[in-house]
């Protein structure tokens, strides 16, 4: 039935059977589309599917009087594969909404397709701020984070904590350049100073020459504007060089899942920005324990996986409000009209451009002697209100925003 792409499991929300070949509209059908076998699989993957399942179960398994069902697939980080899956889901399998979607190119294509077919796209793993900017649609909600918040918001937050002088270690390709640009603008806007930057090729194995330039810069903060294995390798080598004895590392895209690979000895003192951490309060801790019980590796949830849970909950509330899932534009309008409230992100709102607003946290990696368990990795340094973390609605050039 699905020869042209790799598919994960098809899940009936509360343990029911496989959906019939007719794919009838006797149920609400949710698709979780993400990387389940590649570089982002640890960060979303099966964890996002688990989060969606938990949300459906916690909501009661039905919306607008119909059972809610989840289907999932691996887009393999290939645009043609991801777009092909989304089109098949919409055209032949009556999927009402697609969630998660790390990989900005696929996310932008699916957002456009969702508008054309009057479906719903809710991005948690997607990063590009274009989803609520020039490429916004009335059928899209961008839930968890974006490049503006991670770059510019983090720069401002660290300067406010006293990190005034910056030097950037940046991956030499479009993503790294954009991340560096956003962070630089945040630093300067907050009154900080950028002393310089050095660019490294994707997949660099030896960072010695780049780290020597960072050490010699005299900066208080070294902003690490790369991702994945590059982040792990560069931060490990920075610790080995002794750079962290006099300078603080700020990982612009270092998430919780990357820290165990680094080890607390190498990562200690590094700062990151995130809208969710499992140890924030009783609600986040309870969710994390339930999540870990289901996860094959017993991992705790990260922000993007938490975002899938929260966004599925709010989507189901909107489906109930509208009385069905068939009219995607009406469902998204209802999502925007209702305040958001869930145990992971608390109370929030969705703006007219589709941007979900919630606080971010400036977090610092704990020292080894401060950690009491495998996932006890971070401590909160500061809280950044959502209206300060995300791009102002007036600056995004979203055509849905009234001038």
Residues of each region from the PLM?
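Extracytosolic ligand-binding ectodomains
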Residues: 3, 8, 23-403
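Bacterial N-terminal signal peptides
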Residues: 8-18
